[in-house]
Amino acid sequence: MALLTLVLVLAATFAAYRYFFHPLRRIPGPLLAKFTDAQRFLDTAGGRAELTHRLLHAKYGPVVRIGPNTVSLSDPECIKLIYSNKANFPKSDFYAVNDVTQGGQRVCTLFGTRDNAFHAKLRAPIQKYYKVSELLKLEHRVDRVIEDFCGKLEERFVKPGKPCDIAEWFLFYAWDAISDVTFSKPIKEGFLNKGGDIDDLLTTAEQALDYFAAVGQVPILDEVLDKNPVKRIGPPSFQAAADFCVKKLIARTTGAETNDTANQDYLDHFLAIKQASDPADGVSDATVVGWMLLNILAGADTTATTLTAILYYLLKHPDCYKRLQHELDAARLPRPVPYGDAVRCEYLDAVVREALRVHPGVGLLLERVVPEEGLAVPRGARNGEDVFLPPGTVVGMNAWVVNNDKGVFGPDAEVFRPERWLRGDGEGVEGYEERIKRMKDVMLSFGAGRRVCLGRELSLFEIYKVVPMIVGAFDFELVDQKKEWELTNSWFVRVKSVDVRIKPRMLPN
């Protein structure tokens, strides 16, 4: 009885501190968020946390307390304060859930490390290979995957007249494309060729993301689940993908598999970096495998999701679809479509940017930790006064909130309207350029600053090349125009059930 009384007294004292004395006590937000992360955990596990974040900011304003020590911000002005190259805000322990264990030791990944200096060291040797100038050397690899993709759509859906879940097939395309540029071959027989999952990789990826997103809201849970030293209780591992990467590494280093020096892939680049590095740099075989895994596990989902969003919104807005078709027809682009030609298509560019804006790939907070000097959030309070967040506060912004800011994107920010990226009637050149720059600066679809997505240009490269190919070759229509797609937010906002009919398209003379 005495023990129970002690526990209740301690719990009451702890709750009283968080309600009356915690440094964040004056930050508005749900009542439960003052005491526990449970609501945050359950909401994220439900798979649509981005909607909750929008509602919370609509109700409470630009600064919202969503957990005892976690604050969500929505003012675009905060982007440069938290995420710029000059800002020294490390990632939070949310990302620690992404760590792996090797030999009982925790190993941080390029994506998950909370050490900005370590991240810069790990990223520096490889980042140049993700620039457009280097991607152009890989263009023929993406071309052959696109040709295979179009061929499979023709064979499996156009000729037999069967409906196609295009979200699923965009995922197959994205995985095969990233596999080809990484190690010159698809994984096993290839997702497009099989027309389905391989070794449960796609299923495993979904389950791992479900775990990462939810458990990351209460990172201490990961210590007793996935990182449990006695018995691991976590999502399925990516062992099949890791094994494939290891086999490719061994085959390439032993000479069992060779690659033309004039036709290099990412594995060639990674091995060259390892060979040229000083042993003190710590670039090992495990580092190379980690780089390969980062490519294939992080490089496919966002590409596939964006492609699905592009087609879905075009089919929901027939006028936009027709306008894009007319632009591409008039451009008379060669087949396969060169990247340099595609990015010069003005309306195509507007469509891609708008799809990324209304459906960013990541749907949770990009969490950071406030450094020792604290953070003054300008005009964060309802009365327009600044709000001070003390050191150690977990703070972040959600692209699904920021990308819909009406002050930046207009009063119709929640509407898919590619024309907002074009110069308006009567709009001066200088005003247009300033407006576009402002929108680009605020877009958080790929993150921002020093931790911006490494593969951003690679993803866009694959997107800009495939969209004009399929829009030019086929006519798409939704099987049910009234049906909404299925979304699940588990870090990446993945898409399912976008059923379309595909017909061959007769190009105008």
Task: Give the residues covered by each predicted segment.
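N-terminal membrane-proximal hinge/A-helix region immediately C-terminal to the signal-anchor transmembrane segment
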Residues: 2-108, 112-121, 140-152, 173, ...
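C-terminal helix/juxtamembrane-tail motif
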Residues: 11, 491-509
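Cytochrome P450 heme-binding "Cys pocket" and the immediately downstream C-terminal segment
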Residues: 28, 151, 187, 318-321, ...
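Cytochrome P450 I-helix active-site segment
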Residues: 32, 143, 197-204, 261-264, ...
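Cytochrome P450 heme-thiolate monooxygenase catalytic core
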Residues: 91-103, 137-307, 323
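Cytochrome P450 fold signature focused on the C-terminal beta-domain
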Residues: 159, 252-269, 325-345, 358-387, ...
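Short, small-residue alpha-helix embedded
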Residues: 302-315, 466
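Conserved cytochrome P450 K-helix/beta-meander segment immediately N-terminal to the heme-binding cysteine loop
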Residues: 397-433
